Amino acid sequence: MQSSPLLENLMEALRVLPGVGPKSAQRMAYHLLQRNRSGGVNLAKALSEAMTHIGHCKSCRTFTEEDECAICQNYRRQISGQLCVVEMPADIQAIEQTGQFSGRYFVLMGHLSPLDGIGPREIGLDLLQKRLEEESFQEVILATNPTIEGDATANYIAEMCSIHNIKVTRIAHGIPVGSELEMVDGTSLSHSFVGRRDISL
């Protein structure tokens, strides 16, 4: 049995989402058509408006509808002297939820990966260099992912910062809270020893 062209187009469109294969796309399409047509209409409207109006903050490159995001416009953030470099906009949300950081951000939109043709310009390091030259930062916190590519990216940025005599720190990686040592992989355990800190009494 051949599906209608519109149904095929809907399922194909849903497959652009990460982790959505043919079966999942079919299930979603059938659900919207059978049980939630109003939800489908709202989804289409929200997608259309987001694609049209959401761009990148001119300062930190996160997603926003304004020229500058709310964090970059916040005066208290501006005078903190701290800049946190992350790979993706979702990383900002994760850090903000901790309540431990009150500075500004710079979003790379990825990490260095020469084999994939992703070099410094592709992740905006030229724009980061410009910010380091034009603004006064006392500390740059590198919050890239604890991967080979993330570490390479962090090292590259650390060298950039050294030229400007800016303090550079890297977020600690290691043992997750609540885990047992025997269940932790060797790499994480090694990082936890290297990144150990003093206990204040």
UniProtKB/Swiss-Prot annotation:
InterPro entries found in the cross-reference section: DNA_Rcmb_RecR, Rcmb_RecR, Rcmb_RecR_Znf, TOPRIM_dom, TOPRIM_RecR
Superkingdom assignment: Bacteria
Protein's UniProt name: Recombination protein RecR
Family to which this protein belongs: Belongs to the RecR family.
C4-type zinc finger span: 57-72
Gene name, Swiss-Prot/TrEMBL: recR
Toprim domain boundaries: 81-176
A Pfam family recorded for this sequence: Toprim_4
Keyword vocabulary terms for this entry: DNA damage, DNA recombination, DNA repair, Metal-binding, Zinc, Zinc-finger
Biological function: May play a role in DNA repair. It seems to be involved in an RecBC-independent recombinational process of DNA repair. It may act with RecF and RecO.
GO BP: any one term: DNA repair
GO MF annotation list: DNA binding; zinc ion binding
